[in-house]
């Protein structure tokens, strides 16, 4: 039972209890701030920092007495020397049990020593401090360190993915400055999420890749802005609004043909141009073959390649005669 409550600190506390009987009982009944100060002091010895940076020698003479009778700040000063402002308060947010690894206490101490105001404020505002939160905070770009982000990211890997996602949004939205993104994170409501925040910023993208269809074509209208894409998605009642990231990244492009259908293009490798990929009508219903043929003829005229269906041995004639429809 004692090992479960005291974790890795158990052996050190048993030794200290031999020097100053009553330490174990004192730790087990101490308030969270004082108990965590003791764990932080023991972590400093475990990690050889602070006054313990000389090695694994015996505890200093007065250390056991400080642990037994001292206040939280007295214990921290005895272990680290100078105590950065706010350390005792952050330690109290850990709760009753020690963090799983001694080095996590050193990370917390160094955060304040390095004057990481954003990181410290993020921890103060995000409730109980865990090793997971420290991992997320360490991985999260310093610009996005806020309690609202810290509470919504579960792992360091997820924080890394978020960093890259923000970088992508900033690359296509000139208004998504560091200040704008940080401000949006700070203003998040309790029911909001980071994916929704990024989606809102993406919908304002204004730096899209060049479109394969030029403006001014009499039959093709390039959907070259996010507003065009969202408006077309509403009219055609399909999933186009969920493909806007693909458009912004240059992984696909969409144009409207004679206000009858949406034409999907995909990029060829090595920047060799674009390929006609598909044709869609309202609600992704089956597309009439005659309409597909018109789109293909237009793309042939523009020099846009497509999948070659020639040499079919009467297959197209059969489909045309029987009225079979192409499914989008």
Per-region residue spans from a language model:
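Catalytic-core elements of nucleic-acid end-processing and repair enzymes
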Residues: 116-328
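Sequence-structural signature of the catalytic-core scaffold of metal-dependent phosphohydrolases
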Residues: 1-205
């Amino acid at each position: 039972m004692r090992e479960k409550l005291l974790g890795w600190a158990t052996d050190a506390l048993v030794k200290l209890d031999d020097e100053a009987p009553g330490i174990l009982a004192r730790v087990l009944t101490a308030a969270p701030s004082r108990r965590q100060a003791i764990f932080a002091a023991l972590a400093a010895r475990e990690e050889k920092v602070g006054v313990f940076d000389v090695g694994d020698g015996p505890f200093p003479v007065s250390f056991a007495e400080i642990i037994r009778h001292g206040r939280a700040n007295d214990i921290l000063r005895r272990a680290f020397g100078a105590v950065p402002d706010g350390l005792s308060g952050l330690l109290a947010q850990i709760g009753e049990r020690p963090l799983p690894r001694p080095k996590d206490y050193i990370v917390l101490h160094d955060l304040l020593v390095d004057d990481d105001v954003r990181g410290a404020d993020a921890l103060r505002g995000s409730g109980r401090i865990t090793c997971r939160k420290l991992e997320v905070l360490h991985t999260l770009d310093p610009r996005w360190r806020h309690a609202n982000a810290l509470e919504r990211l579960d792992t360091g890997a997820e924080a890394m993915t978020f960093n890259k996602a923000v970088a992508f949004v900033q690359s296509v939205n000139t208004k998504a400055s560091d200040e704008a993104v940080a401000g949006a994170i700070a203003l998040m409501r309790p029911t909001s999420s980071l994916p929704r925040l990024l989606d809102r910023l993406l919908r304002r993208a204004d730096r899209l890749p060049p479109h394969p269809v030029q403006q001014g074509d009499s039959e093709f209208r390039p959907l070259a802005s996010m507003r065009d894409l969202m408006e077309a998605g509403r009219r055609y009642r399909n999933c186009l609004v969920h493909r806007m990231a693909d458009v912004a990244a240059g992984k696909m492009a969409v144009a409207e043909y004679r206000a009858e259908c949406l034409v999907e293009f995909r990029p060829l490798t090595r920047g060799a141009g674009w390929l006609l990929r598909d044709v869609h009508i309202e609600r992704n219903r089956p597309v009439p073959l005659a309409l597909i043929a018109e789109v293909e003829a237009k793309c042939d005229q523009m020099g846009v390649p497509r999948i070659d269906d020639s040499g079919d041995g009467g297959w197209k004639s059969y489909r045309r005669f029987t009225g079979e429809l192409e499914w989008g």
